[in-house]
């Protein structure tokens, strides 16, 4: 199995979910530093959706087979080895840098 690292896209089901949370077997991108994924089975992921909504924290995927937008305001911590997942692909360095820069804004004091 391919090692999950920062920038990896996987498909995984996080059901059961509630309310407006993303449901079903769907793509997620790993945002945790690769040191975290190397020594732990737990990492922070953002869901990927084909939403049409424009929002500063919904970042379109470019340069990938996976389509949609990364929903940076819906981060989840996943124990990915406790669930059935499938590695899909890695994003480009440029896209990963863009995602990480936007995620930092979510945690700034405001």
Protein language model regions, located:
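Conserved functional hotspots at enzyme active or ligand-binding sites that engage polyanionic ligands
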Residues: 1-110
